[in-house]
Amino acid sequence: MQSHIRAFVLDKDRKPLMPCHAAKARKLLKKGKAAVFRRFPFTIILKERTREASAIQDVLVKVDPGSKSTGLAVVRKDEKNVHHALAFICLNHRGSKIRDALTSRRQLRRGRRSRNLRYRAPRFLNRKKPKGWLAPSLQHRVDAVMSWMNRLTRLVPVAGFVQELVKFDTQLMQNAAISGVEY
């Protein structure tokens, strides 16, 4: 997990304010006007200032999902609708590690069940998955992104979320002349 650019700021009531530059955060800490609230993502809490006395702009959290990693960008919009990046976070997913651990468990379980045990009733596929079930590696990806989105709403005055939805035709990218039955 990596984070860049700004320090998150909370007021004395732990309500989120606009992120500030790292140098400004250092000056506030040195003067005693702020204290370190959290080390990652680096967050300071102001000792005197409140949200009402601060200028707050609209902040968006942009999500770029991927199979191995997901990118989160905290951006603010100015008057001309130009986005300025405040922070970048890269979440590296553990999907392949989860899959490997489940494969190992499955192999051990099948080894136990294939032993020659007499007088045991045979097992059949008698288990149904609940509605909305996702594979554990995919569920981890969803849970990790959702937990970071919730965490960012506590650290930044978020006005909305934007998710990049992209579909790629990988067969067409490999072979431009593909058509019909070849698909």
Residues covered by each model-derived region:
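Short glycine-aspartate micro-motif
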Residues: 60-62
